[in-house]
Structure formats: C-alpha cells, structure tokens
From Swiss-Prot:
Gene3D superfamilies: Anticodon-binding domain (3.40.50.800), Bira Bifunctional Protein, Domain 2 (3.30.930.10), YbaK/aminoacyl-tRNA synthetase-associated domain (3.90.960.10). Its EC number is 6.1.1.15. This is Proline--tRNA ligase. It comes from the Bacteria.
Length: 564
C-alpha cells in the first residue's frame, strides 16, 4: 500500500475538551473524527487498528468453540419488559418508536435477544452446550459522553452468550471463556489483570473483569506479587490478621479536647495509627449500627452493604448519633453507649488488643481497650475495609494497587434471563428444564483507546505490534525527484509483503522531519528509510519506535531486525 493513495490526515492541534491522552492522540493521528456528542467516525487508519483487534478476538472465540451470529441492534420492548430491564436499565437505554407507535430500544447489550434466539432454536439437552457470539455496534445514552471512544455512546463490542443444562457445565464454559480472554489480551500485547468483580446491573453469580493497567484508569485494582490474584478494590481482601494478643494495659480515659480524627489522636498520644479504631455510625431498617475499622483503614461501602442486615444502610445523622451514643461526632466508640447498639467490627479490629476508641464523651478517648473485658466481643466480624498498598496478601505476596481500564467482563448469569423468556429444553428425564446462561463481553473499540493509554510517549502512540496499523513503513526521501529511489523502495515493500509483514510505503513527498514525526505519532513499530545516499552505500536507515536512535543496516540485517 502506498500512503499517497491512502487517506492519512494528521494534525498538530487537538480540541481543548480532549482530556485523555488516547483521545488527543487518536484525533491528532486522524484515527477518529467527532460526528456528535459521543459519536465518532473511524477513519481508514483507525479502522485498520480496530479490525486487527476484532480479528484476534474472532480467532480466539472461534478457537474456544463459540459460534458467530448477529442479533438485531433494535429490539422490541416486550423482551426487555419480560426481564424487567426496560425500566431497570435506566436512562442509558435509548428508547424509540416506529411509525406504528411500537416501542423498541437500541440495544446496549443482548441478553434478551440471545435468550429468545435460544428459546426458538434449542429444544433438547442434546444440543447443549452452545455459545453464540457477535461483534456489533452497541449504544448507551451516556449523560456525559467523554474521553473519546473510551466512553462513547456508540461503541463496538464482542458479546457472547452461552447456554447450558447444569450449573457445572455453565462453570466450565465460564472457565473456558476466561482462558480465551487471557489469550486475547496476551496476543494484543497488553499489560492486563483479570480481577474479581461485582456483577452490577447485569446480575448473576460469579463475575470477573479484565482491566488494562493504565494510570488514567477509572477503576482501582489490587493485585498480589505472589500469584495471579487480582481484584477490584470493592472486592479485594488482604491476608487475615494474626491472632489477637493478650491484654497488657488497663483501660483509662484521656483528654483529647480538639482531636477528632484518628490521625490527630495517634499524634497526641504518640502511638501508631494502627492502634486506633475509627467508629462509623450508620442506620438500617433494623436500627442503629456502629461499624469499626482501624484508624489507618477506610470502610469499603460495597463490602459493608453485603453484611447481613446492612444492605440498605446510610450514614447516621448527628441527632441519631447523640440519641444512641450520647455524644457528638468525633468522639464515638463502642464502650459505654447511651443505648444498646449493634457492633460490626472489621476483622482487623476484632484482632486488636490495647486499642484506642472514642469515649462517647466530648473531648475524650479511651486507651487500653480490650475485647471481652471492657466491651463484649463484637456481634459481627467481617472484612469491611479497603486494602492498602504493600500489605500482605492471602497468598503470601504483597498487595499492589493500580488503576485499570475495564475492557472485558465475564459473568455466570444462571437462569434469570432464560426463566423470564421461558427458554427451556427437554432434559434427560423428558421434563422441561430452564437453561443456564453465561455472558461474556469485550469492548473492542475501548481496547484501542486503552492500549494507547498504556503505550505512548511525548511523540505519540507506541502500538503493541499486533495492533499497529502497519508493522513497517518504508519512508522515501524525495520520491518525485528520484524515480530510482522510489523504485527501490517499492521493491523493498514487495519483499516485506512477501515475507508476511504488514507494510506500507510512505511516498507522500513530505519533508523528512514531518514524515518521521507522522510515523512516531502513528506508533509504527518499524521505520525504514530509503534514500539516494543509502542506496549508494547498499544500506537502509532503520529505527524501531522505541529505540533512541536510528541505525544503518544492509538488507540481511534489516530483515533480521524485523524477525525474518
């Protein structure tokens, strides 16, 4: 391919509203152009990258035994009413009417369509298991589309739906898809983590997200240096605490007139922050609850909501705190409460001895507090905190925190969608059985942006080789002035293509500096320069995108550098 015959339009300027590096670089490289809020046209250059990602995803899905289909993007309200998601999905669901006033939605996902297709097509357990996947445009009516294609309203997605007779078979396919996703992101050359996750609005039991590691990621992740353990911070856990030590101090009240935070109290008393306990007052339908975490820890709201009886909790107001504890906020504690209260202690707090808590007296704290002596053992002990960088993981490694961009998600849905749409088969006993479903999504257009967030420098994109629009670009100096140089460059291009390399020829006639800057901006892994001087010496100027300098190579050396 000659770039003089290809549409390539790079720019130096980017709109002020392009916040993320990926958004700025995709605009500068001419990969995308904005059509409307959250809607982007993919240029020929951008589409080359998108199709390369799509091809790897398709190859690995086929390898895993999934079968490609194509569901309608416009889906009738009746299906979504049956599952309850017409209302539950919220404002992101774009609802439309046809000329007959029949209601439809532009699908953001296709569980309903897949379950309906399975209901029509699968009659017997002998046809199972089956896994249908599609690669198709989706639409979610984001309130504030931002970050370019990272959070666009329209996006390209691979979504797959598997059908099973038993939970065990559903779990096997879940593991099969996790393995396929690992192969996909490995082949794409991305630094990623598979993390335990919450199922969210889609629902289901087991759930795992795949995140590309990037400083700009919206999600906080924790992973261990000792194994492949990784989890979203909402689900991450550290190693259990050591057994509680014996009490060695007597409880006494100390004055803390202006010290309302654990940090201030620890500094006043000259003790480690880990010995202090933070008391968080919440209200539930059943009443007042005091949640205890160590002073150096923070309550994890999602974990806390999973504690029995706390699903609907909210923070208590000052009047509720005074009613139950008899003091103002800042001096709360589980000892000598004005009224009996339920105590939920984080497991690290339950393992403390000689700790410090608020005295339920304004301007005072208690030191030397011990469970079983100064207050009853906690009614509930649970992991209700966020993990901390560097602490010990359950596998013996250290926990590391990072930011991640979610690019894939796998779910075990169970029977909820199949039940709602009456997707049944005849089982071995001749009876109707509701099928089990799995759901597996990959954001293909999002992967492109995530890869740039992870791989760039001041000059532009640094594509992982499998995603680059071309692996090699042959750059010609003064092609119009020297036909011999252009002919030599074309001959080299033909040899590169014959060797199986995805290559192009830059014969646009730009000044060398501008041409080289474009190649760096576009993230081309290998740049080869053909010039009159080089031809005379029998060499080519070669530079890898990540190299500090160019080098002169003969043809054999060049092909060796390119792995051929």
């Amino acid at each position: 391919m000659r770039l003089s015959q290809f549409h390539l339009h790079t720019t130096k300027e980017t709109p002020a509203d392009a916040e993320l590096v990926s958004h700025r670089l995709m605009l500068r490289a001419g990969m995308i152009r904005k059509l409307a809020s959250g809607l982007y046209t993919w240029s020929p250059l951008g589409l080359r990258v998108l199709r390369k990602v799509e091809a790897i995803v398709r190859e690995e899905m086929n390898r895993a035994g999934a079968v490609e289909v194509l569901f309608p993007t416009i889906q009738p309200r009746e299906l979504w009413d049956a599952t309850g998601r017409w209302e539950k999905f919220g404002g992101q669901l774009l609802k439309i009417k046809d000329r007959k006033e029949q209601e439809f939605c532009y699908s953001p996902t296709a569980e309903e369509a897949a379950a309906e297709f399975a209901r029509q097509e699968i009659n017997s357990y002998k046809q199972l298991p089956l896994n249908f996947y599609q690669i198709q445009t989706k639409f979610r009516d984001e309130i504030r589309p931002r970050f370019g294609v990272m959070r666009a309203r329209e996006f390209l997605m691979k979504d797959a739906y598997s059908f099973h007779l038993t939970d065990e078979d559903m779990a096997r396919e879940y593991d099969n898809m996790r393995a396929a996703y690992t192969r996909i992101f490995t082949r794409l050359g991305l630094d990623f983590r598979a993390v335990q996750a919450d199922s969210g609005a889609i629902g289901g039991d087991a759930s795992q997200e795949f995140h590309v590691i990037a400083d700009s990621g919206e999600d906080s992740l924790a992973f261990s240096t000792g194994s492949d353990y990784a989890a979203n911070v909402e689900a991450a856990s550290a190693a259990p605490p050591a057994p509680r030590a014996a009490a060695s101090e007597a409880m006494q009240q100390v004055a803390t007139p202006t010290q309302k935070t654990c940090e201030d109290v620890a500094q006043l008393l000259g003790i480690a922050l880990q010995r202090t306990v933070k008391s968080v007052a919440v209200m539930t339908q059943a009443g007042f609850v005091l949640v205890l975490v160590r002073g150096d820890h923070a309550v994890n709201e999602i974990k806390l909501a999973k504690v029995p009886g706390l699903a609907d909790y909210r923070l208590a107001n000052e009047s509720e705190i005074r009613e139950h504890l008899g003091c103002e906020p800042g001096f709360l504690g589980p000892v000598n409460t004005a009224r009996p209260v339920r105590v939920v202690a984080d497991r690290d707090v339950a393992a403390l001895a000689d700790f410090v808590v608020g005295a339920n007296v304004s301007g005072a704290h208690l030191v030397g507090v011990n469970w079983g002596r100064d207050l009853p053992e906690p009614e509930t002990v649970a992991d209700v905190r966020n993990v901390v960088e560097g602490e010990r993981a359950a596998d013996g490694g250290e926990l590391r925190l990072a930011r991640g961009i979610e690019v894939g998600h796998v779910f075990q849905l169970g029977s909820q969608y199949a039940q709602a749409l009456q997707a049944t088969v005849i089982d071995e006993g001749g009876k109707a059985a509701v099928m089990k479903m799995g759901c597996y999504g990959i954001g293909i257009s999002r992967i492109v942006a995530a890869a740039i967030e992870q791989n760039h420098d001041d000059a532009g994109i640094i594509w992982p080789a499998p995603m680059a629009p071309w692996q090699v670009v042959v750059c010609v100096i003064n092609p119009k002035q020297d036909p011999q140089v252009l002919a030599a460059a074309q001959a080299l291009l033909d040899q590169l293509l014959a060797a199986g390399l995805d290559a192009a020829l830059d014969d646009r006639g730009l000044r060398p500096g501008a041409m080289f800057a474009d190649m760096e901006l576009l993230g081309i892994p290998h740049r080869v320069v053909v010039s009159e001087r080089g031809l005379a010496a029998g060499t080519f100027e070669y530079r890898a995108r990540t190299a500090d300098a160019a080098e002169s190579l003969d043809k054999a050396g060049l092909f060796s550098r390119l792995g051929h």
